[in-house]
């Protein structure tokens, strides 16, 4: 390429690797379990294994969308805290919680292997179910039949998914829905972003997923 004609640049995008928790699943209704999983995930280790081309979000809104805030500080990597929460919920490494992670084999096996290893440290026996993407679309996305799921959501401005209980997350939080409604109704962009930021933080604190 002629450097005087073409310029190559890199920028943030809207892609979000989402580890989703089925909020209607009996095992995952316990917020302590969801929080423990958040604390137990070593994002730096996972990102390093992928060539350090990604970064942790900590929340449901990417940096290119209105309402973004770095929420990684809500659940920093803390195995001891994760173990404490799991013990409160009735699980230990000697009495593990068994969960299944379902995700498309197009993403390879490394992510699943890393999560299995990391969660084993806090008393979670994670089974990995690698499926064809078409199977994931039918079983997880369409039917909501899963416990944990991992997928790259590339859509921008898609916070509405966290306000739609019928979406495969099965997440139902009236406060989040009310804040999102205020964001949509706001006539000022700054006000809209403020409500989105509040809603995103509420979602992240509730721990129905990890990014």
Where are the regions that the model predicts?
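Extracytoplasmic/secreted proteins, especially bacterial periplasmic and envelope-associated proteins
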Residues: 32-36, 41, 45, 77, ...
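Second-shell loop/turn segments in exported
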Residues: 22-27, 33-36, 67-75, 103-105, ...
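Ligand-binding "clamshell"
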Residues: 1-9, 143-146, 158-168
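Ligand/substrate-recognition segments at binding pockets and active sites
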Residues: 87-155
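Extracellular/periplasmic solute-recognition and catalytic clefts
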Residues: 1-24, 148, 152
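Structural transition elements
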Residues: 55-88, 108-110
């Amino acid at each position: 390429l002629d450097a005087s004609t073409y310029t190559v640049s890199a920028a943030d995008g809207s892609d979000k690797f989402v580890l989703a928790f089925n909020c209607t699943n009996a095992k995952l209704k316990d917020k302590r379990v969801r929080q423990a999983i958040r604390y137990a995930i070593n994002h730096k280790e996972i990102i390093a294994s992928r060539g350090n081309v990604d970064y942790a979000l900590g929340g449901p809104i990417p940096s290119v969308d209105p309402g973004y805030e770095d929420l990684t500080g809500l659940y920093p990597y803390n195995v001891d805290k994760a173990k404490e929460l799991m013990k409160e919920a009735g699980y230990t490494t000697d009495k593990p919680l068994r969960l299944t992670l379902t995700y498309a084999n197009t993403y390879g096996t490394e992510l699943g292997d890393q999560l299995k290893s990391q969660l084993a440290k806090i008393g979670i026996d994670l089974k990995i179910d690698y499926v064809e993407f078409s199977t994931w679309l039918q079983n997880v996305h369409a039917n909501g039949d899963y416990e944990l799921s991992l997928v790259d959501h590339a859509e921008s401005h898609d916070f509405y998914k966290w306000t739609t209980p019928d979406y495969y997350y099965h997440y139902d939080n009236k406060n989040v829905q009310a804040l999102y409604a205020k964001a949509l109704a706001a006539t000022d962009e700054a006000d809209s972003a403020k409500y989105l930021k509040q809603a995103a933080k509420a979602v992240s604190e509730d721990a129905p997923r990890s990014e």
